[in-house]
């Protein structure tokens, strides 16, 4: 039944009951304290009223005594100063009595009887006060007979009657307050005893409920935790009820089932780990062997790369020398091309000069022809002249012979010049062909020079590339050696991992997963082959 009630609800009800009991107890205490305070205030007020009324009566008696002394001194004809002093004292006492009585009247009256008594006291005070005022006035005006016949004693007696009534009333109030305080004490004691009994019953019930609903279930939960700590995961956990403890049992059962599944998975995982570790060991051995083979191959490759680097370096040197020779040949060819070009220009100038000489010879030939014609004309004219012209005819014949010889010489020179011009033209053509050939040679040599430069650059780049490849091969060799070291370290780590797996298997072997089961777990011992080094 109690298992179906939530602990929070029960604790809430317990707190509510505690609150009700506390509020009830505090309420009773407050009621008693308030009633006592009211009684105390009433007693205090009664005492203040008694004190104020007693002081008023005492001051009134002082005033009456002073007036009586003043009347006696007046009748005995004492000095006026003494009488005046007594009168001043009497007047001051009367004024003070008025103030004191007003404070008495300002105090709240209780019931109707007290208010009536207060009014009667006020009347008797006013009467007594007026009689004393009259006595003072008569005494100051030397009406001694009126002073002596004033009914002061009667008014004083009336006030004293009211004063005594007030004393009785105040005593009655004090007695009533005392009796009420006694009753309140008895009621408080009864309530206190009742509260103690109820609290004892309540605390006993709460302790029984706490032990039944919290302590005992928590002890059971603790025993389950001890069983789980001891490795017993097969102990059944009963879940009943619907309160928070039930939720803890349900969570504990869920935790037990989860632990059972976890331990089972760990067992399976440790076995699979052993298998995987064995495969890793085999793979490490294989990898170690291949790494060593790769290291040997890389060493051979590094040696070959060194030889290739030396050969390529020699080729690069030869290519640089060939490039220098090609540069020199290109320079020489360019110089020859310049000289051939100069020769071509000179042959062209010679051809031009020969043509000019031919033109001059043609002019000379024309002149000789004209001279021959003129000589012929002169001979004709000399023949006509007869003997006078015979000498002129001889001269004309000589001139004609000279003209003929000049024309013949001019023809021969012209033939020679034409032959020379033809040969010069042929030489110029040959020089032009030689110049074109030299240009082709210079262009070819320049291309050869460029190609040799490119070959030299390529050889240098190839040498640098081969050096980088050799360096990379050397680094690969170092990395391979490091990999071999890592493989050895991995083998050691694998062996340690196998030991840890064995330790893990031995640790989870203490758990009992099923009831009446004795957990036995055979560790798989891995035969780790040594890594080939």
Curated annotation (Swiss-Prot):
Q: Does the keyword Nuclease apply?
A: no
Its membrane topology: Multi-pass membrane protein
Family matches, as InterPro entries: 4HB_MCP_dom_sf, Chemotax_Me-accpt_rcpt, Chemotax_Me-accpt_rcpt_Me-site, HAMP_dom, MCP_chemotaxis, MCPsignal_dom, Tar_rcpt_lig-bd
The HAMP domain extends over 212-264
Residues assigned to the Periplasmic compartment are 34-188
Alphabetically sorted, this entry's keywords are: Cell inner membrane, Cell membrane, Chemotaxis, Membrane, Methylation, Transducer, Transmembrane, Transmembrane helix
Pfam families named in the record: HAMP, MCPsignal, TarH
Mind telling me which Gene3D superfamilies this protein's record contains?
Answer: Aspartate receptor, ligand-binding domain, Methyl-accepting chemotaxis protein
Q: Where is the Methyl-accepting transducer domain?
A: 269-498
Q: From the Swiss-Prot or TrEMBL record, state where the protein is found.
A: Cell inner membrane
Q: Could you tell me the Gene Ontology terms of the biological process aspect for this record?
A: chemotaxis; signal transduction
Q: Which GO terms describe its cellular component?
A: plasma membrane
CDD domains per record? HAMP (cd06225), MCP_signal (cd11386), Tar_Tsr_sensor (cd19407)
* Positions of modified residues (Glutamate methyl ester (Gln)): 293, 300, 307
Q: Where are the transmembrane segments?
A: 7-33, 189-209
**Residues found modified as Glutamate methyl ester (Glu):** 489
UniProt xrefs under NCBIfam families? PRK09793.1 (NF007309)
- What function is annotated for this protein? Mediates taxis toward dipeptides via an interaction with the periplasmic dipeptide-binding protein.
Q: Which family does it belong to?
A: Belongs to the methyl-accepting chemotaxis (MCP) protein family.
> What protein name does the entry list?
Methyl-accepting chemotaxis protein IV
Quick one: which gene encodes this?
Answer: tap
